[in-house]
Amino acid sequence: MKTKIASLIALFLTTVAINAQIDRSTMPKPGPDPVVKLGKPIKFTLDNGLKVIMVENHKLPRVSANLSIDNKPYLEGDIAGVSGMMGSLLGRGTKSISKDDFNEKVDFYGANISFFSSGAFGSSLTKYFPEILELMADGMQNPVFSKEEFDKELQVTLDNLKSNEKSVTSAARRVENVLTYGRNHPFGEFTSKESVEKITLENVINNYNTYYKPNNAYLVIEGDIDPKATKALVKDLFSGWQKGEIPTYKIPETKNVSNTEINFINMDNAVQSEIAIINNVDLTLGDDDYYAALLANNILGGGGTARLFMNLREDKGYTYGSYSSLRQNRYAGTFRATASVRNMVTDSSVVELQKEINKMRYKKVSAEELENSKEEYIGGFVMDVQKPRTVANFALNIERYNLPEDFYENYIKNIKAVTLDDVQNAAIKYFRGDQARIVITGKGIDVLKNLENTDYVIKYFDKEGNPTVKPPMTLPIPAGMTAENVVDKYIEAIGGKDKVDAIKTTMIVSNATIQGTPLVMTMKSSAPNKTLQEIAVMGNVMQKSVFNGETGYQSARGQKMDMQQAQIDEAKANLVPFSDMAYKKGTLDRIEPIDGVNYYVVQFNDTEVFYD
């Protein structure tokens, strides 16, 4: 027993001594940089020009194949959208198998195959991969473009365009591209109702026959493969794919504006402004300052700890998030700093965005910011290289951009070598705050007055990117026209005062399901000026609001609270069941044009009501 006690005491004292030597107030020293060994992919080229890259990885019994057609961008012109439609129609049957049988086979194997205008993708368990690659190859090389499927896809495309007609975000992205690249640039054209209606089945077939060729394509196969057997399979399935001469389009040079300007797109239905500060850049993967540019953008707007986010969201509360992106591209790169903000702070947001961009250019970032950004990139890179598909993509980039074989193995070293001067020089070169387009899509009547007080010239464009004039904010109110006149005309239009007065009670019942739980909201109103609003969950009333014409109360979860005098006054003013009768006492504030309709805007207390 004494021996055991002595041993325990000795162990306790040793533990105390070890703990006493640990200083938990200081950060532990970092270990050595991880060494990245990506391995050597297997590469070969078929006689038709198809370049094949195979990456072995036996961690999971799965294989994927990604075919990427690396054509130079081209202009689709009057039939913009034809390539997208062609890609959508691939995989809907081949010359040897119907659409339904094709899909049934893919489902039977528990696999995935998808086609698009610039390639295809397939993945499956290892034992089914030969069958899946065969289906994928058949769908790519022997498609059937039927009139029936074409008509269906045409209608789907038109329906999607129609549903986006009033989308502020869609209009913003569309016009941003038109202005940034130009209409004659492949990146600047867009699909429209007019261009889609001009597309014929023959156009789709011609697009496939012209551009869907192997001699500009890469096939990347990654996963649990036997290289020898897979190489033989690829040769068997793809050697018969006929190569062809692919026409090239001379891509226009993109240019920045001489001086920063505001490009405004008026959207009457916008409840917030879409802001994008954009300039063109010449940046390609592997450029000498590529890593410095990555880090500069990450510090400015790469995430939730970057400068734009911390300023516009955390400090000012203008937006849910503000970010920047630096797009490297062989044909036309761009820098963008963006935010979606409330109308009333649109001008202030522009000022803050520009302030952060110019601060990056004219003042060095701190050593701490640079170090944190490096660690973030290195950490993300180390995690990414654990994924087999990432390794396959790296191999593809090395081929596509003609990079050194050790480009990614030296990635960490090159990131760590970036200096404070390098970051500032990259910011000066790529963040052109002095030659940028500040593209704002929003509601002119709410934001233009303050934007006109900035130092920037404002140019106006419509939803298709065509130059236009400043939109009319309001129209003059005719002499003698009042809120009472407007409401009277509305009452007359819906049936007349007698019929309105005859309705003494209204009830609206709304049903919803939230995470499987049924919810019912009931709203009752009765003359003179009595209301009840009730929310019930699974039959139990969770919240209720009652007004009897003179007083009222609110209750929730068994707690009852009488209405305050201000709430009583507001309830009395509403004049239910038809609140419009109360609006007669409001003010006719303005006549506002919205989508070609002139709306009479009546202001009543804090409410604006639009009458057409």
Annotate each language-model stretch with its function.
Residues Q21-D33, Y218-V220, E371-M481:
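C-terminal regions of mature proteins
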Residues Q21-T26, R92, N164-K213, V234, ...:
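Scaffold signal of the M16-like zinc-metallopeptidase fold and its non-catalytic homologs
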Residues I22-K29, Y218-L283, G442, D446-P472:
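An aromatic/glycine/proline-enriched structural segment found at the starts
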Residues S64-T126, K166, P186-F190, G302-Y318, ...:
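M16/MPP (pitrilysin/insulinase) zinc-metallopeptidase core fold and M16-derived inactive scaffolds
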Residues G93-S96, S124-L154, T284, G303, ...:
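M16/insulysin-pitrilysin zinc metalloprotease superfamily fold
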Residues P227, V597-D612:
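Gly/Pro-enriched, hydrophobic low-complexity segments
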Residues A276-I278, L300-V341:
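A structural supersecondary motif
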Residues N485-D488, E492-K560, A582-R590, D606:
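N-terminal mature ectodomain segment of secretory-pathway/periplasmic proteins
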